[in-house]
């Protein structure tokens, strides 16, 4: 199958959703050689991935995942694509604790760094979380604490062999887009940041096709986040429809910040910034985390609009609920109560 698909891609033809799924199944089953996989990924990238192709790939990723059980109808993910190269602190990870502190269950999917010096797994490990905890520990954390970390390499074993091919290629491929689309707990409510604005409507279309209940696909001022530095492009997905609009920090009741104010560093530095935000420190990092938490709270139905989401997030921080979620997640993953 992969050989026929490669020929079609080289002739600049799009693949149908079922064709893409068949190729992904072949890759997962070990039926394609490394050379074939590398050529396929490069040809797909050169042609340009479509909604149907990404959706077909994501369906296989979801079907092949080692699933995490969550006994909740509504829970959110704040996993983005990474790869924006802007080296901010871990905004979406910080936002996840604020969302949990506000009372919404979070199944945070993530990995180690893509282009930054600190991915979500890196910063959480620096904070004391066992990011490679066993499945039952992750499920217990989600149930008892209201937040758990779903470490991608542990939970997507079918595509482990592709990691080496991706490293050798050294360029972005469809796999850079698939992580946030394949939450191992099956989250249908999410905030998904993308590294380029062109992906906002495309991944919005993918989430709509895959049955997302309520999601925000965002790109703000070069960041795979909602920006407090300027304009954010949004595709809000509900009931199979994608509403596109743009917004600025003032629309959320937040002031504008310089990008230097939200700059990060290595995992230890980013851990300090995250902890400071959860401790109530004012400034750009707090506002950036609140903006992204607000979207997750709206997606989950906990807030009527983004301004209310910012207010609820701020209350969760200021009463200590967000920092308590971090402390309890560390304790549970380390074998405590």
Swiss-Prot record:
Keyword annotations from UniProtKB, A to Z: Amino-acid biosynthesis, Aromatic amino acid biosynthesis, Glycosyltransferase, Magnesium, Metal-binding, Transferase, Tryptophan biosynthesis
Cofactor: how and how many bound: Binds 2 magnesium ions per monomer.
Positions of anthranilate 2 binding: 166
Residues given in the record as 5-phospho-alpha-D-ribose 1-diphosphate binding sites: 80, 83-84, 88, 90-93, 108-116, 120
Positions annotated to bind Mg(2+) 2: 224-225
Gene3D superfamilies named among the record's database cross-references: Nucleoside phosphorylase/phosphoribosyltransferase catalytic domain, Transferase, Pyrimidine Nucleoside Phosphorylase, Chain C
InterPro entries, sorted: Anthranilate_Pribosyl_Tfrase (IPR005940), Glycosyl_Trfase_fam3 (IPR000312), Glycosyl_Trfase_fam3_N_dom (IPR017459), Glycosyl_Trfase_fam3_N_dom_sf (IPR036320), Nuc_phospho_transferase (IPR035902)
Chain positions recorded as Mg(2+) 1 binding sites: 92, 225
GO biological process assignments: L-tryptophan biosynthetic process
GO cellular component: cytosol
Cofactor(s) needed: Mg(2+)
Broadest EC class assigned to this enzyme: transferase
Pfam family for this entry, one: Glycos_transf_3
Catalysed reactions, as listed in the record: N-(5-phospho-beta-D-ribosyl)anthranilate + diphosphate = 5-phospho-alpha-D-ribose 1-diphosphate + anthranilate
E.C. numbers: 2.4.2.18
Pathway: Amino-acid biosynthesis; L-tryptophan biosynthesis; L-tryptophan from chorismate: step 2/5
Protein family (similarity comment): Belongs to the anthranilate phosphoribosyltransferase family.
HAMAP family listed in its UniProt record: TrpD
NCBIfam families cross-referenced by the UniProt entry: trpD
Task of the protein: Catalyzes the transfer of the phosphoribosyl group of 5-phosphorylribose-1-pyrophosphate (PRPP) to anthranilate to yield N-(5'-phosphoribosyl)-anthranilate (PRA).
Name used for this protein in its record: Anthranilate phosphoribosyltransferase
């Amino acid at each position: 199958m992969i050989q026929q698909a490669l020929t079609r891609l080289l002739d600049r033809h799009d693949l149908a959703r079922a064709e893409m799924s068949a190729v992904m199944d072949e890759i997962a089953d070990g039926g394609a050689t490394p050379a074939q996989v590398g050529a396929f990924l490069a040809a797909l990238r050169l042609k340009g991935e479509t909604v149907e192709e990404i959706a077909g790939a994501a369906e296989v990723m979801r079907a092949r995942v080692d699933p995490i059980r969550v006994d909740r109808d509504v829970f959110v993910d704040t996993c983005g694509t990474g790869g924006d190269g802007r080296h901010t602190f871990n905004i979406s990870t910080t936002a996840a604790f604020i969302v949990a502190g506000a009372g919404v269950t979070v199944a945070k999917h993530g990995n180690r760094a893509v282009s930054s010096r600190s991915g979500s797994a890196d910063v959480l490990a620096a904070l004391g979380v066992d990011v490679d905890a066993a499945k039952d520990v992750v499920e217990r954390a989600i149930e008892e604490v209201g937040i758990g970390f779903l470490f991608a390499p542990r939970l997507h074993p079918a595509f482990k062999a592709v990691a080496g091919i991706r490293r050798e290629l050294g360029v972005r491929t469809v796999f850079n887009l698939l992580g946030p689309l394949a939450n191992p707990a099956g989250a249908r409510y999410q905030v998904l940041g993308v590294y380029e604005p062109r992906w906002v409507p495309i991944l919005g279309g993918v989430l709509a096709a895959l049955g997302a209940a309520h999601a925000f696909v965002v790109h703000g001022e070069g960041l795979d986040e909602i920006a407090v530095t300027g304009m954010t492009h949004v595709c809000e997905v509900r009931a199979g429809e994608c509403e596109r609009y743009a917004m600025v920090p003032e629309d959320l009741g937040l002031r504008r910040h310089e990008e230097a104010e939200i700059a990060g560093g290595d995992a230890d530095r980013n851990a300090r910034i995250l902890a400071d935000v959860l401790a109530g420190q004012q400034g750009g990092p707090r506002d950036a985390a609140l903006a992204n938490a607000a979207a997750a709270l709206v997606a989950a139905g906990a807030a009527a609009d983004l301004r209310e989401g910012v207010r609820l997030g701020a209350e969760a921080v200021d009463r200590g609920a967000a920092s308590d979620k971090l402390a309890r997640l560390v304790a549970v993953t380390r074998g405590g109560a």
